[in-house]
Every structure is written in structure tokens, then in C-alpha cells.
Amino acid sequence: MKAGVFKTKEEVTSDIVKEQLVSVKELTTLKYRYTNVVSFENDNEFYGMKIPFTTKKFIISYDGEVSAGIDLDKAKVDINDEKKAINISLPQAKILSHQIDEDSLTIFDEKESIFNQLKIKDFSEFRKNEMKKTEQELLEKGFLEEASKKSKDAIIEILNINPLIKDEYTVKVN
């Protein structure tokens, strides 16, 4: 029997392409590392006036990292064999994670009053607010738009690993 007599035709289907993408799940395409030095101050008030000797405050430094990308479970794949085209619709990029490195926390100044003591709740709420503020600043600077652009480029690279796709199909990502 000659080799190649029963040669099978390889073909690209939307299921194969979708499986190749979904196996990745989440695609992180952009990371932002930062260091912040921020202060917290709180006084007890009585009818809008600060009460003396009730100030609590701290100054803290920390490192953080924000990751953005896309959820590939929500990608839609359409293959046109006649035109040899693969069209992929991606969801909008989103912030996938935001973490503060607990080992990087440094407290420079800490002051509390016997009448207004620092509590873990103060730090916890402060941390949440600072994280939201950082995320908002990134959104205003186009962080997610950049993550979307990099996601599109990464998807094309991932699919072009398959020689059949690279040689025979045009990949378009929306």
C-alpha cells in the first residue's frame, strides 16, 4: 500500500477555531504596574466643625498591578470557506484583575487620637477607594482601548500558529 493514498483533507471549522481560542479562557494583553504614595486623614466633626484632638491619619506607599484583556468564552467565530476568511468578534476589553502587593506596603506616618482610633476598616475602605481611583484614571487614559487593540493582534498571532490558517485564510478580528 502506498503512503498518501488515503490522504485526508484538513479543514478549518468554526468549532476548531473557537476551541483554540476558548482553551485560553481569558487573554491578558496589558498590564500596568504602579507605585502610589497616598495619605488618609479623618477628624470627628460636630455640626461641620472639626473637633480638636480627634485626628487620625496615615501616609502609606504601595505597589500595585492592573491587568486588562478579554474573556474569550464570549468570542464569536464565523468562517467563510469560499472567501477563505475567518471573522472573529471579540467582547470589549475589561479589567481582569487589580492587586496590591501586600509585601510592598510601607507606612511612613501614623497618628491616631484616643477619641478617634485607626481601625482595619479605615484601611480597607481607603484601599478600595484608591484602587477605584487608579482604575478610573486608567480608563480615562484609554487603558481598555489599548488592551482591545493588543487583544486583536494577539488573536491573529494565536490563530496563525496553525499553518493551515496562516497559509490559506485571512483572519479579521472585530
Where are the language model's segments positioned?
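Domain-level marker for long, solvent-exposed, non-transmembrane regions
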Residues: 1-174
